[in-house]
Amino acid sequence: MAGVAGPMLKRSRPRGARFLVGLLAGEVAAAGLMSLAVYVLGEGIALILGAPWRASLTGVALVVFGVADLANRTPHIWRQVPQEHIRTMPPGMLGLAWGFDLALLFTTQKSTSLTWGVLTAALLLHPASSSLLLVGMALVAVATVTVRSLTWFLLPITRFGDRVQPWFPWMRRAAGLGLVLLGAYTVWTAWR
C-alpha cells in the first residue's frame, strides 16, 4: 500500500490523500462486516461449547499459528490486492476497493499469524469484542500505511518491498514465539 500511496502523495497530495481516505473507508466497512460475521458465529459456538473448551481451542490454535510463523509458514493465500486497477480507478475508489479487500482478512497475504490469532480469540473467547478488535486492526493498518507513505521520501521502499529488510524475519519469529507462549498459557489456565 505504501508503495502506491507514497509515490501518489509525491506526485499529487490530493490524489494520495483521496487514496488514503478511501483505504480507511474500505478497511472500516469490511472490518465492520467481518465483525458481524464473527459475532454471530462466535455466539453460536458459545451456545454449543463451554468456556473451558473454547479457551482450550483458542490456545491450541494460537500455538499452531505461532509454530507456523516460527517455521516461516504463515497461513495465507498467495494473492495481493488487484494491481490492474492502479491505472483504471480513481484514487479514492482504488483505496476503497483495496481497503475492503484487505480488511476481509482471508483474501490477501499475511506477514504474521497475529491476525489469525486475534480473529480466533474474538470468535471463541469474546465475540462481542469483535467489532472493537477488527475495526481497531483496520485503523492500525491504515495508520501504518499512512505513516509509511509519508516517510516514503525519507526512506524509499526497495523494489522488493519491506519484506526483504533484515528485521522482517525477526518480526515474524517474535510474533510466532509470542503466539506459542500465549497459546500455551491459555490452554494451561483454561481449566483452572
What are these regions (language model features)?
Residues M1-L33:
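Juxtamembrane transmembrane-helix termini in multi-pass membrane transport proteins
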Residues L181-R192:
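Juxtamembrane boundary at the C-terminal end of a transmembrane helix
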Residues G50-G66, L125-V142:
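Alpha-helical transmembrane segments
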Residues L41-G50, T115-A121, W191:
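Membrane-interface helix termini and inter-helical loops of multi-pass transporters
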Residues I48-Q109, F153-W170:
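Alpha-helical multi-pass membrane helix bundles of inner-membrane/thylakoid proteins
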Residues A141-R159:
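Transmembrane alpha-helical segments of integral membrane proteins
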Residues M1-V4, F106-V118:
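Transmembrane helix boundary and interhelical junction motifs in multipass membrane proteins
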